[in-house]
């Protein structure tokens, strides 16, 4: 699942920026992990190790999910599906709304992004409240995909996002867990 001494090496590579984007928030910055080639390779290998069964597509959530999705897809012999902010994809799309702290946002995929029944692994850098990830699952399922697993570098378990995904039948894996927000 997450953490333990097994991933202490990766935890050390993730920078914490206090009070960003607002007071009281501890921003977990993976750019320092990405700068380290051994850390990046290790994170990718460990994310790959938690994948269960065959996968047809790896769906990366914009933007940092795009970092890990192609590497995982190549290793799994799968395609990459990009989940973008609404309005960023040309052509026909389907979209799903999700709530933010102060409003609503929307994500989208192309209408032909996945075949009905496609087995999809959802990937992002971090899960907090799970709003974006849950919207991504709804969107993919609306497109006919079978989403049964999600993989993250970081989980903020106190915010409940991973548990919310589990309640929707998703197996959730994260490399490290951090306390707080």
Please provide the spans of the model-predicted regions.
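PRPP-associated nucleotide enzymes
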Residues: 1-181
């Amino acid at each position: 699942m997450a953490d333990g001494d097994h991933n202490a090496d990766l935890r050390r590579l993730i920078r914490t920026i206090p009070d960003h984007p607002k007071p009281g928030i501890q921003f977990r910055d993976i750019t320092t992990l990405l700068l380290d080639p051994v850390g990046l390779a290790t994170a990718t290998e460990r994310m790959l190790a938690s994948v269960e069964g065959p996968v047809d597509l790896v769906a990366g959530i914009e933007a940092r999910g795009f970092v890990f999705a192609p590497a995982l897809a190549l290793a799994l012999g799968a395609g990459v599906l990009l989940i973008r902010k609404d309005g960023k994809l040309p052509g026909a799309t389907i979209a799903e709304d999700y709530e933010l702290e102060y409003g609503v946002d929307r994500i989208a995929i192309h209408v032909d992004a996945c075949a009905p029944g496609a087995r999809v692994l959802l990937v992002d850098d971090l899960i907090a409240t799970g709003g974006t990830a849950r919207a991504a699952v709804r969107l993919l399922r609306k497109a006919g995909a079978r989403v049964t697993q999600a993989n993250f570098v970081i989980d903020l378990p106190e915010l409940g996002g991973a548990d919310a995904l589990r309640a929707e039948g998703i197996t959730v894996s994260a490399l490290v867990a951090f306390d707080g927000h």
